[in-house]
Amino acid sequence: MEDFVRQCFNPMIVELAEKAMKEYGEDLKIETNKFAAICTHLEVCFMYSDFHFINEQGESIVVELDDPNALLKHRFEIIEGRDRTMAWTVVNSICNTTGAEKPKFLPDLYDYKENRFIEIGVTRREVHIYYLEKANKIKSENTHIHIFSFTGEEMATKADYTLDEESRARIKTRLFTIRQEMANRGLWDSFRQSERGEETIEERFEITGTMRRLADQSLPPNFSCLENFRAYVDGFEPNGYIEGKLSQMSKEVNAKIEPFLKTTPRPIRLPDGPPCFQRSKFLLMDALKLSIEDPSHEGEGIPLYDAIKCMRTFFGWKEPYIVKPHEKGINPNYLLSWKQVLAELQDIENEEKIPRTKNMKKTSQLKWALGENMAPEKVDFDNCRDVSDLKQYDSDEPELRSLSSWIQNEFNKACELTDSTWIELDEIGEDVAPIEYIASMRRNYFTAEVSHCRATEYIMKGVYINTALLNASCAAMDDFQLIPMISKCRTKEGRRKTNLYGFIIKGRSHLRNDTDVVNFVSMEFSLTDPRLEPHKWEKYCVLEIGDMLLRSAIGQMSRPMFLYVRTNGTSKIKMKWGMEMRRCLLQSLQQIESMIEAESSVKEKDMTKEFFENKSETWPIGESPKGVEDGSIGKVCRTLLAKSVFNSLYASPQLEGFSAESRKLLLVVQALRDNLEPGTFDLEGLYEAIEECLINDPWVLLNASWFNSFLTHALR
């Protein structure tokens, strides 16, 4: 192919193509089809411009022979073929002198007669498909698009072909000749298919035969063929039409489409009120683990055996007492519940054989904590039809809460690395098809970046707790079963490690429907003093239960050990989703994969290796009050994973509503950034729908705060 290109094209064109490929770091010895495509595109641009001039009267004329007496100006300015810096200098100069709007992408030509930039396309596929790709990329009404194909077809914006028929015929003939020459040398098939990497859309989806007839038959009235309809749609101005249609709907509907400008959007209003509180089902950054390395005890792997072994590693137990009461609860009952757990664990140890499960005695404190006999009696509706004042319970509106800094700290912590590995390679699943080693390579790179992440620990902790709780809820419906909160990991040295975070005591669990609730009491170890951020722990009663010796650079120091106790509840459907938290790994991997795909399509080769191994490159992670935060690809992986994990941990109707409604505003802002001149009606109604979801949920409030930072920096 390289020899053919050098023989077929003018040496000046070949030299320009070589420079262009060098500028983009591409090897013409390897990417010979691309070399041919660049030369073809350059030649079409030059042919488009050749012989076209503007005379003294400002008229466009075609002059094939030089007339030394004519004062002629070239009709087209050629931008394609110049190096990027020079090309942008030319574009800026044209914009300054003609008042034309500066394009986002480098165009190929400027037409001084029509005062517009032109994007030339040469395709080996169907012109309509290539035209749409170009239009979607450029997203500008000010750049005129003209596409030629090797089969003699062409397509242009609003069916305005700019040049006379003879000039266009010359270009089409040249393209046809190139095709014939390639075919004679056996190069055409490879060249044609290379535009898409393998089989082209042209081969698979060319609209011919019956499909073409159906397309022509299914057009709206007054359109004779598909091309006419496409040209009409391409030049369609929607706003006035939409306004007209809306005004027909109802006398009350008066939708005036307002332009959406940089100054239009306002920040989302976050609620005032007391600070929001922690509402996750288990502790996150504040959790403390009692651990055993290389477990080899009798019954290893049985949760109760593992828990007792972990409890034996700690020697600093002391008489527990309340340090932060729950404002509305009977706090002595929480204290008594913990003492009961300790006592019953001691009883187990005194037995000859430790049982596999432990059902707690149904004491008054546990009955209170688990809401036993607290549910109102259910009465059949038919038995109370004649009750005159029958009504639903009065329920108070939820109290508005303000954003608190602890939730951002939780998120930051979730993105950090720990010194343990929380997933093995097979957590994401083995290849089920030989979809090539690229898929395995991406999975392995991604796993390496996230396997030590704290968010991954939360996944495995959530999977374990939800699985154990659902199993116990089905197997021991009437029992107050003691469920250890356990996770497993590997140390840096590769040794296995079993961790105990605390215990759950399950209440009665006759779960018939997906949404039926099982109550549980959670008791979790921590070194965090609750008095530092009491608002975070509103729902908890916190006990001090021991002193832990910690080794530090200075030496050993003693820290009080706390137990965070609260009553909580969950349902079958929530536990089912909790068991599937590993999906978060898959979701964030797919997001990373789409970034790799975008990069690969630009470079026209798989960029997986470069993507993960180029440690110097940074990527945008998110918005903060300081602006766009950048980080390594590993940090991007961990941030995306943490977002997915928090969406699972803090799932709620408020989050569903906020995500759906704020996305609409995000799309409008993105359209503005892409210079698409969006218009809106009832924007304030959209803001109301968004702000209606901002009540008291910490994760939703944090997302709203991030959205405001995005608005600030996106519209500068």
UniProtKB/Swiss-Prot annotation:
The UniProt entry's GO biological process terms, in alphabetical order, are: cap snatching; DNA-templated transcription; symbiont-mediated suppression of host gene expression; symbiont-mediated suppression of host mRNA transcription via inhibition of RNA polymerase II activity; viral RNA genome replication; viral translational frameshifting
Where does this chain carry the motif Nuclear localization signal 1 (NLS1)? Answer: 124-139
Free-text comment on the cofactor:
Binds 2 manganese ions per subunit.
Instruction: Name a single GO cellular component.
Output: host cell nucleus
**Binding-site positions, Mn(2+) 2:** E80, D108
Q: Where is this motif: Nuclear localization signal 2 (NLS2)?
A: 184-247
Family label? Belongs to the influenza viruses PA family.
The name on file for this protein is Polymerase acidic protein
Task: State the species of origin.
Answer: Influenza A virus (strain A/Northern Territory/60/1968 H3N2) (Influenza A virus (strain NT60))
